[in-house]
A protein has these predicted regions:
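Conserved D-loop-proximal element of ABC-family nucleotide-binding domains
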Residues: 78-80
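Walker A/P-loop
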Residues: 1-28, 91
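Conserved catalytic/switch belt of AAA+ P-loop NTPases
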Residues: 82-103
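Walker B catalytic acidic pair
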Residues: 66, 72-74, 84-85
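AAA+/SF3 P-loop NTPase mechanochemical coupling elements
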Residues: 36-37, 56, 60-66, 96-117, ...
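Inter-Walker segment of RecA-like/P-loop motor cores
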Residues: 29-50
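A short beta-strand-to-loop transition that corresponds to the Sensor-1 phosphate-sensing loop
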Residues: 72-74, 99-100, 113-118, 135-136, ...
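Conserved AAA+ ATPase core "coupling" helix
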Residues: 15-17, 107, 122-180
């Protein structure tokens, strides 16, 4: 997905470089490509939001500003971590409050969420059998709260594809970007 996005303008590229520098990541040139953050589903709310006791550490939300925040296996994230997305999605900024300081960082990102229909991944899949009790399915999908779902503009159900089908698509990111 980030390969489809346009290059960053000067102001956004500078913001991205500043946030990377704050996060302790190397900044040798002003990158024009949008950032892409894909935290692991075990990431805590602090890993998403950021923090630090003495030195500010931008989290994945701020590091994705100007680009894409991809949450794969979103149903596996804690509800607390997912709820941390609500305020930045609404306001376009992230506020970090710690003893002795308050920081406001940009948080204008495209959120892409992928999740299975249930913990085993087979619910509703033709030819597969779901082994999950209905309570487990409700609990799993319940981690995506109503207020968070309200901030997701496009919802798309997909069927499984084989590795051969995925590779056979034949459209490069560059070609798709030209069409966009």
């Amino acid at each position: 997905l980030p390969g489809l996005l346009p290059d960053l303008d000067d102001e956004t590229a500078l913001q991205v470089a500043s946030i990377r520098s704050l996060a302790g990541l190397p900044v040798t040139t002003l990158r024009r490509r949008p950032p892409f953050e894909a935290p692991h589903h075990t990431a805590s709310a602090v890993a998403l939001v950021g923090g630090g006791s003495r030195i500010l550490q931008p989290g994945a939300i701020a590091r994705a500003s100007g680009g894409v925040l991809f949450l794969d296996e979103a149903g596996e994230f804690s509800g607390h971590a997912l709820d941390a997305l609500r305020q930045p999605l609404e306001s376009g900024r992230i506020e970090i409050h710690r003893v002795g300081f308050r920081a406001v960082l940009p948080a204008r990102f495209q959120l892409v969420v992928a999740t299975n229909p249930c913990p085993c991944g087979n619910y509703g899949i033709p030819g597969d059998v779901c082994s999950c009790p209905s309570l487990a399915i409700r609990r799993y999908l319940g981690r995506l709260s109503g207020p968070l779902i309200d901030r997701i503009d496009i919802e798309l159900g997909l069927q499984r594809v084989s590795a051969t089908q995925a590779v056979g698509a034949g459209v490069t990111s560059a070609a798709a970007r030209e069409r966009v």
